């Protein structure tokens, strides 16, 4: 109703969310550049960022002193990753570590933790029992049990994975009291930011888990998307404001294991003040292969990395349209008519 009544201003936004989803984030590269390089630049009040996996990496780039340069480093490193044959989890983790190191640069950690108004938070999943093992049989069994437990009830996922919320300790985010699953809140510090970001994107089975993160409870930390794929959390926890959520689809899927569970929906109260920006079917049709880039592209274009890289770069270029449409909707006031209640 706030947008219907008064439009959208940069200061109306209190939280910005970024989903996991591998390369799907690429279509928001230009929108992120506009938002963090221009739209939010005069802001004084804290803007809380919450992401999982690639969403966390996006926001770590955005929270640096020169966000445009950091975003370009991230985009270049992410698109440029290549693998010989079928990579091992250790090899994929090593490549991901290179991406995180490259996007942070020499001063990124310090700049993120001293940013004047951006407050970075991101999700990880602390594995329990065999879900935390790197032995393939035990890990497979642990993940299978997690799938079965989650199918019965999302709360049962907490038997296998606990939330690990890394947050900027200068201001506790409004969503820090999230429930449903066991939660560890972990203050960000120079010693743990890089390892935490790597953990947030460490896909189970595909990558090795991250251990011995300073300031975090002992254990193995995996991709934040396991518990919070597209995030069903109390973003505002009763506070005023809007949650800006650029998302690659209209459906919000709480956890990664919920992707095939059609009836698993987010809590309507958590979505009450969420402004979801989703691409239209026409936009998706205009992309190479008529789809948003995804992890399957690594398999589709195996041995043809140049072709994959070219198509991903084309998708990034085409996504400039999303910036134009957002700016036009906000500045013209048309967003008042365009915005519709989010269907849960």
Question: Predicted segments — roles?
Answer:
Residues 1-48, 61-344:
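Patatin-like phospholipase
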Residues 53:
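Catalytic nucleophile serine of serine hydrolases
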């Amino acid at each position: 109703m706030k947008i219907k009544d008064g439009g959208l201003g940069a200061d109306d936004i209190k939280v910005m969310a970024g989903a996991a989803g591998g390369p799907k984030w690429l279509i928001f590269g230009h929108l992120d550049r506009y938002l963090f390089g221009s739209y939010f630049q005069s802001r004084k009040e804290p803007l809380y960022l919450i992401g999982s996996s690639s969403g966390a990496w996006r926001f770590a780039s955005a929270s640096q002193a020169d966000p445009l340069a950091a975003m370009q480093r991230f985009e270049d490193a992410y698109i440029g990753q290549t693998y010989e044959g079928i990579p091992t989890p250790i090899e994929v983790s090593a490549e991901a570590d290179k991406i995180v190191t490259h996007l942070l640069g020499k001063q990124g950690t310090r700049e993120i933790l001293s940013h004047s108004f951006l407050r970075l938070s991101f999700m990880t999943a602390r594995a329990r029992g065999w879900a935390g093992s790197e032995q393939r049989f035990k890990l497979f069994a642990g993940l299978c049990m997690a799938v079965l437990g989650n199918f019965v009830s999302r709360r049962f996922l907490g038997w296998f994975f606990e939330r690990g919320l890394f947050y900027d300790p200068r201001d506790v985010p409004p969503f820090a009291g999230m429930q449903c699953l066991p939660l560890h809140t972990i203050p960000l510090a120079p010693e743990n930011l890089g390892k935490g970001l790597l953990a947030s994107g460490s896909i189970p089975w595909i990558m090795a888990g991250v251990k011995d993160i300073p300031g975090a409870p002992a254990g193995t930390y995996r991709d934040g998307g396991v518990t919070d794929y597209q995030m069903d959390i109390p973003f505002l926890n009763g506070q005023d404001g809007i949650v800006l959520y650029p998302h690659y689809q209209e459906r919000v899927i709480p956890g990664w294991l919920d992707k095939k569970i059609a009836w698993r929906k987010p809590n309507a109260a958590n979505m009450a003040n969420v402004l979801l920006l989703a691409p239209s079917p026409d936009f998706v049709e205009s992309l190479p292969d008529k789809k948003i880039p995804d992890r399957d592209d690594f398999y589709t274009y195996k041995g043809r990395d140049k072709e994959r890289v070219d198509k991903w770069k084309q998708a990034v270029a085409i996504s400039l349209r999303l910036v134009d449409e957002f700016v036009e909707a906000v500045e013209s006031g048309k967003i008042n008519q365009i915005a519709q209640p989010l269907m849960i």
